[in-house]
Amino acid sequence: MKLKRLMAALTFVAAGVGAASAVAAIDPALPEYQKASGVSGNLSSVGSDTLANLMTMWAEEYKRLYPNVNIQIQAAGSSTAPPALTEGTANLGPMSRKMKDVELQAFEQKYGYKPTAVPVAVDALAIFVHKDNPIKGLTMQQVDAIFSATRLCGSKQDVKTWGDLGLTGDWAKKPVQLFGRNSVSGTYGYFKEEALCKGDFRPNVNEQPGSASVVQSVSQSLNGIGYSGIGYKTASVKTVALAKKEGAAFVEDNEQNALNGTYPLSRFLYVYVNKAPNKPLDPLEAQFLKLVLSKTGQQVVVKDGYIPLPAKVAEKAIKELGL
């Protein structure tokens, strides 16, 4: 289910959050984390680069509470999570996209049931440009025409210069330099599906190994444009407001707009786990996820620049996990 439909169903309102809010608000109805006893052992996480900082920060908090826990984190990209979970080489599979059917089938073929997707944060996938770029906003059709070779979203012409996007003066003839993620990345897959209408990327997109690399590359290129999770924003870049179609209002990538579904590139971030039906999770995994879905865990989400879960989403996940 897409984020906007779920949020509409929950009728969640981000109380007290203005349109220009830079700091996400914690839902006061989120549960407090209660420390358990006897939690120790080894926990491994393999998956998303987008979630790398979050997983590390959650791991640090978890180890503070449980010093006898050792946590290993590998963050090469979302596509590394499904095989690691299926092969049993990881307990946790952080992903910035949902698993594909073929990934679910491989897991189900081995275990007889599907892995459980746990929503852990909300992300606004942002379009970044250099801080000195005067562009005010882009339509989703323009975004497709910038990054795609196929233009399946409906744009009638390619975008090769900033003049093609309406900039004038010295900017008009400047070529657009593209930065993005590689195909192992869940962000790559999500952007391909949602922003390119399942089309193909241009061959001249400079593929970067991580989200931070995309933002850093854009910050060093006056002509640059790239896509990455909002949590990687720095002072050297700015994000571009997006409109769903020509003539529609440009929408900023803030908490309120991500949660109410008006921002076009809102998504859940997930941690997948191997939970057998009618069997409790191992205490190591259970307490980690319980921490992540608590006020304490969601404060970490805010600290890392992402958007915390509404309490109703966290409650649903807690119930499904039997925590």
Swiss-Prot record:
SUPFAM superfamilies: Periplasmic binding protein-like II. Disulfide bonds: none annotated. One of its GO terms (cellular component) is periplasmic space. The keyword Secreted applies. Can be used to remove inorganic phosphate from water, which could be used to control growth of microorganisms. Transmembrane segments: none annotated. Its main location: periplasm. Keywords: Cell adhesion, Periplasm, Phosphate transport, Secreted, Signal, Transport, Virulence. Pfam families: PBP_like_2. Residues 1-24 form the signal peptide. NCBIfam families: ptsS_2 (TIGR02136). PANTHER family: PERIPLASMIC PHOSPHATE BINDING COMPONENT OF PHOSPHATE ABC TRANSPORTER, PHOSPHATE-BINDING PROTEIN PSTS. Binds 1 inorganic phosphate per subunit with a KD of 0.34 uM. Required for phosphate transport. In strain PAO1 implicated in host cell adhesion; in some virulent strains (e.g. MDR25 which expresses very high levels of this protein) antibody fragments against this protein decrease host cell adhesion and increase transepithelial resistance of human epithelial cell monolayers. Its ability to bind phosphate may allow it to acquire phosphate from its host. Belongs to the PstS family. This is Phosphate-binding protein PstS. It comes from Pseudomonas aeruginosa (strain ATCC 15692 / DSM 22644 / CIP 104116 / JCM 14847 / LMG 12228 / 1C / PRS 101 / PAO1). The gene is pstS.
